[in-house]
């Protein structure tokens, strides 16, 4: 995805563009590291950004040029701590002045910038901005006082009741979810639905770029309530990994899925695990997991592409995989989808050095196994087995053997 698309997506969903938000969305920055930085546990955010500095600066400058082209206004943001002992301390984004300047900008529409004289003359505007900061930093008691102050200053404020709801929900997230064991999943799912349908739209409307920080404790609360719960097809989004995904906490996503012995049988979990590996820079494991998903979801009866699998593939963010997928779809002679796993493996021959026997065992796809056996025989210089494996691959699909011969 280009930086232009990233800017467009943020403008559409949050009304402004923030480089920090892009880093989190793109997986270059783990939310747990960002949160630790805000809590004063990390002194320099750049150390935890998984992107080469030169490339990062290039991408951020490209985004700035596009923002300027759109007529957006860049405002410098002060990033301060979320704890009492660092609440007034300006946090360090980077040791590089150039990168600090780029990361500290938020780009907003001209119409969203309050006129300075109006801002200075209207105390309710000042209070509202303090309230937004208190909500983002999870200072619920301070937010309570600021809501009362806003009411005293402007009892008819259009968003007053919305802010009251956000403060009330913030207090609500401080207690664990109270659910009877026999109704646990149902109760947690009701919490999730309320969060997604009511709180998230309100938070994005009122807090915009700061909504992620406000919402994180709610998702963490749901995730922690679901830890150890196996996937339940009746409540597909009531799995800890789903809640962790909303926070872009990919380490926790990976852990919660691998801790569920049933994950290999569920497409949602396999795709989420593949994404987690991708954003954790474990590319080979990501592609292998995606092959497991393809094997699970592909319709072997008529060899056609399953609709839900196609949706997964269209959302998968790996550029090399997408290129292989596109080449397969663009072949002059249309091939049955059942041979796609073998096609992927032959386009990603390095995968054989990373595949564990336990990962192969659940895969039933004949084209994958034939391609794998051939690549292993070639790697081991076993000419007899390679010849037999070539015949086996040819019997499954001539095109796959042709592809193998092209790369060897």
Identify the residue ranges that each predicted region occupies:
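Positively charged, polyanion-binding regions of nucleic-acid-associated proteins
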Residues: 1-20, 25, 29-30, 35-50, ...
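Generic helix N-cap/helix-start motif at coil->alpha-helix transitions
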Residues: 120-127, 156-157, 191-200, 228-238, ...
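Helix-turn-helix repeat elements of alpha-solenoid scaffolds
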Residues: 135-144, 172-177, 192, 204-221, ...
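Residue-level signature for tetratricopeptide repeat
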Residues: 133-134, 150, 167, 239-244, ...
């Amino acid at each position: 995805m280009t930086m232009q698309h990233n800017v467009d997506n943020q403008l559409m969903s949050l009304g402004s563009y923030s480089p920090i938000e892009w880093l989190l969305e793109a997986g270059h920055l783990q939310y747990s590291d960002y949160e630790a930085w805000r809590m004063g546990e990390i002194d320099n955010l750049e150390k935890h950004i998984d992107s080469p500095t030169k490339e990062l600066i290039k991408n951020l400058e490209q985004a700035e040029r596009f923002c300027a082209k759109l007529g957006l206004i860049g405002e410098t943001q002060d990033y301060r701590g979320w704890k009492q002992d660092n609440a007034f301390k300006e946090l360090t984004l980077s040791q590089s002045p150039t990168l600090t300047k780029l990361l500290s900008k938020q780009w907003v529409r001209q119409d969203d910038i309050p006129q300075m004289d109006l801002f200075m003359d209207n105390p309710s505007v000042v209070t509202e901005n303090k309230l937004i900061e208190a909500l983002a930093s999870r200072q619920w008691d301070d937010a309570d006082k600021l809501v009362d102050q806003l009411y005293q200053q402007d009892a008819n404020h259009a968003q007053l009741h919305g802010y009251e709801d956000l403060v009330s929900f913030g207090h609500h997230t401080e207690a664990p979810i109270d659910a009877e064991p026999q109704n646990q999943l149902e109760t947690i799912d009701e919490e999730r639905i309320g969060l997604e349908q009511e709180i998230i739209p309100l938070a994005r409307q009122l807090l915009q770029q700061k909504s992620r920080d406000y919402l994180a404790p709610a998702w963490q609360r749901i995730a922690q309530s679901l830890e150890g719960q196996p996937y339940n097809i009746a409540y597909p989004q009531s799995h800890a990994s789903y809640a962790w995904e909303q926070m872009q906490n990919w380490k926790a996503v990976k852990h919660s899925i691998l801790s569920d012995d049933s994950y290999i049988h569920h497409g949602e979990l396999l795709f989420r695990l593949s994404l987690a590996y991708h954003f954790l820079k474990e590319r080979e494991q990501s592609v292998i997991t995606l092959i497991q998903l393809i094997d699970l979801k592909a319709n072997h009866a008529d060899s056609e592409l399953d609709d839900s699998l196609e949706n997964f593939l269209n959302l998968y963010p790996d550029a090399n995989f997408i290129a292989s997928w596109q080449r397969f779809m663009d072949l002059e002679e249309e091939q049955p989808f059942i041979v796609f796993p073998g096609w992927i493996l032959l386009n990603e021959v390095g995968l054989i050095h990373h595949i564990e026997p336990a990962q192969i065992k659940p895969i039933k796809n004949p084209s994958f196994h034939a391609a794998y056996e051939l690549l292993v025989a070639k790697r081991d210089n076993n000419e007899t087995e390679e010849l037999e494996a070539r015949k086996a691959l040819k019997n499954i699909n001539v095109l796959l053997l042709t592809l193998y011969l092209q790369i060897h």
